Every structure is written in structure tokens, then in C-alpha cells.
Curated annotation (Swiss-Prot):
GO terms for cellular component: cytoplasm; nucleus. The active site is at 265 (proton donor). HAMAP family: Salvage_MtnA. Keywords: Amino-acid biosynthesis, Cytoplasm, Isomerase, Methionine biosynthesis, Nucleus. This is Methylthioribose-1-phosphate isomerase. Its EC number is 5.3.1.23.
Amino acid sequence: MVAAAPSNKERLPDMMTSIRLDQSGRVEIIDQLLLPHSVVWMPVSTPEEAFDAIKTMRIRGAPAIASLAALTLRSYLSSSSSPVSSSSSSSDVISWVGQTIDYLQSSRPTAVNLGEAMDRIRAALKDSEAQNQTAGDIIQRVKKICGDVHDEDLERNMKMGRLGAEWLWKKRGGGKKGLKVMTVCNTGSLATSGYGTAIGVITALFQEDHLDTAYYAQTTPYHQGSRLTSLELTTLQIPACMICDTMLGSLFQHEDIDGVIVGADRVVKNGDTANKIGTYQAAVLAQRHNVPFMVVAPVTTIDLSLPTGAEIHIEHRPAAEATQVRGLDTETGKLSVVRITPEGVGEGDKPWQRVYNPSFDVTPAELISAVVTEKGVAERKEGEKSIDVASIC
């Protein structure tokens, strides 16, 4: 009797991870600036080092940077280098932790997950002060929250992956062996604590044998797609195809795309979504071709305090990130950075030297078919221009 071939679920290789703890509990991250050509783990021991890693995008992805900030704070509070300890006064602990989380939050203002994690700590500090807790108790409480921020992410990502895959298969799976989907940026294990958001849905489709091909955009100028998503999908051996950002229209014209699946850095009350630059254009094309457009993000990414996307602060990145590119020299085998524009572009103040380099764009809710969180799926109703994301918080 011939044994049945293993399913995709059974043969899925181990996923990558962006954050780990060494034997002493010290935080380490993969330097994502060196990926995919070199995997280098770098220690992050202080809040200043965490701030720098987030600001320089050595780690990126809204859930991942929240985890890094939280885990680094926990590790630092346990170290001999910490300026506060159980022997400090409660007021000193509250003051130092408060200043530190403000500092960490300023490293990436668009990503709401980081702010949500820091707000959890702020609320705990306020409550601890009201209860007159000891310095030691306050420190332990903060450390517990920091650990929870990281641990909760993986579980909810797997829930979102399942919910999103089920929703899209129900919408487009009839009579098909597998779906063709498209994604932007990097939303997998390198951007989260594990499994991923949008890539989590793609992985779930693959595990259920419901995936034909996952197309992913290069996502210039930082190449999160060509550098990071490509690495994750090839590691997982998921059928995938890279496309240049300028090829999205051609892809929709010539392939029967079943869905666009993206992550988010912030989803506001009406469903407007801030995500990596290039998401909006994918949404416009998806609507033109009647393709479902799905946003996948944890509840921590939803910001009900902002009514519309017009209020979202959009971070602009240095011009050098658009005028230069980092890669592997195929002749020398060494990593190098090369300029791809004429000298002076992005470096001077002349009208002909300017570079427009926003890190995010905002996709209006009227272009989004559904928002998926770990709590459920909120669909945009026919003819409506908003989505009731509060129902899945």
C-alpha cells in the first residue's frame, strides 16, 4: 500500500524569527539591513540600542518593534545597568520607566502597536502609583506586561491566519484548486513575533492546500518584499513569484488574482489603513479588477481614537534610502551600497534635488473589502465607505 504524500501542513519548514533571547535572557535581533545575504544576530541591551535598531530599521514591522521595545525594557530592568531597582523609591521607578517608554515610542510614531504596548505600561504605572506599590512590585509588574506583549503576538497571528484564509477561500475558492494572491511589504515572522499577519494568511492557505501562487511586490525603496518576504517564502517553500512595484497593473491584467492581502501599521475607526508605501496603489488596482482586498492586523493595531486616516501621522524617511541601494556584489561576493541617482539628488536644497520618500500611505476604507483581527472579520458592506472595525476589537 502506497503511503499518502505529506500535506503542506506536515512538511512546512521551520519559520524564521526576528527576535530571540540568549541563555542569559539578553535580547538579540536579526539585523534586517543585511538580509537576505547575511543573517547576523545583534544584541540589544539598552533602551538606546532598541531605539536605534527601530529607527534605522534593523528591525521593522509594527508587532516586532513593539516586542523589541518591551523585551529590551524587561531585560534592562533585570540588569545591573538599570538606574532603578527594588531598592529605589517608587516615584523614581515610575519616573524613569515613564520617560523611557516615551523615548521608545518616539522611535516609530506611525506604528500603533508600539504605542499600545507603551500605553499598557503607562496604565500600570498610574495604577501602581494609586495603590502605593513598592518599587519592586512596580518593576515586576512592568516586566510581566513586557513579556505579555511579545508572547501574545504569536497566538493571535495564527488565529488571524486561519480566519483570513477561511474568509478568502469562501469568497473565491469555488471550483478552484488553489488561489492566486498578492501582497505588499513584509508581514511574516520577520515583522512579528512569529507566523505573521498577511503572510500568516498566505501560510494558512498553503497549509490547507488552498494556495496556487503568492505574488509579492518588491516594495521599494527599502525592498522589504524582494529582501525579506522573498527570504521567508523561499524558506517556507511556498509557491511564490516576485513582481516589481510598477508591474502590479500588468499582473492584474494577465493573471486571475483572487485576493490582495496586506498588513497594517495603523487602522483607524472608519477602517482607513496606514501601511507600507505602495499599499494604496494595490488597493486601487484591486478595486478596478474586482479583487477582494484584505487587511490583516491584530487588535493592537486598531486605533479607535482617530476618526479617519487623515489624522494619521505619516513618517518620511531619509532621501538616501531612495537614492541608494544595498546589495551583494556578484563579482566580489561582498555587501555594498551603490548610488542609483545622479550625484546631488536628495543631498541639496535646490528645487531639482528633492526626493519624496514617505514610508507609508493611507488606503481609504472604501477600497478595502475586509479587515481581519484575532477577534474576527469585519466586511465592508456594499455601497458603504467605512468598515465597523470596532466590532472586531
